[in-house]
């Protein structure tokens, strides 16, 4: 058996087309386009690539894209003041601060400074709390993008056994909440988990989000399972490698995401969805 490929790039392109159409309809009706402000601190090459991709996606669908590229030595006070300025700007529907930040910046305070209704990354404690209470508003982009991918398989997710490998605040923990909301029975694994292969071998859905190349062996995958590889590591030759042994896992899984081209495009597509939602449902 060779798994079906979950083509996040193609699915995300369709989402972006629908968003672009909706933005054009808004402009035709005399309404303003959604506005997204993206803040980049410093010149980390990986962060610059991520931010460039997000800004390009915004412009392609017709959003108003605001770029704030700040020097690495920007103070906490100045960064918070900029966020306050954007919070008060009625033409800005979403504020995104590219993580990670410098060691002198308190990232949690920065996230909490963003108005919850403009937190299109879905990281604010208010938005995580609503997701916990099964009242989602603006949802974390990567986890919700994964749910969108899973829905495209046509499976009924209710009652399925799901394993999340990785317990970060960005992906692992909100991923657990999204899967619970979808009706899955969820196990979350982390650095202290013993015998990692055991829960994985029983899982109908495996979401890997660690950033450790080939952590998950293909032979661990339950036949017919769905494998979502969120993690990626850039190798010395420039190629990207996921957390899962792709080729061997592909021989056992029913569905699997590639790296790259799987989850990454869905994260950006969900960011655009969140920004449009904030515009139409929270700011009008």
UniProtKB/Swiss-Prot annotation:
One of its GO terms (molecular function) is methenyltetrahydrofolate cyclohydrolase activity. Pfam families: THF_DHG_CYH, THF_DHG_CYH_C. InterPro entries: Aminoacid_DH-like_N_sf, NAD(P)-bd_dom_sf, THF_DH/CycHdrlase, THF_DH/CycHdrlase_cat_dom, THF_DH/CycHdrlase_CS, THF_DH/CycHdrlase_NAD-bd_dom. Pathway: One-carbon metabolism; tetrahydrofolate interconversion. Keywords: Amino-acid biosynthesis, Histidine biosynthesis, Hydrolase, Methionine biosynthesis, Multifunctional enzyme, NADP, One-carbon metabolism, Oxidoreductase, Purine biosynthesis. Homodimer. Belongs to the tetrahydrofolate dehydrogenase/cyclohydrolase family. This is Bifunctional protein FolD.
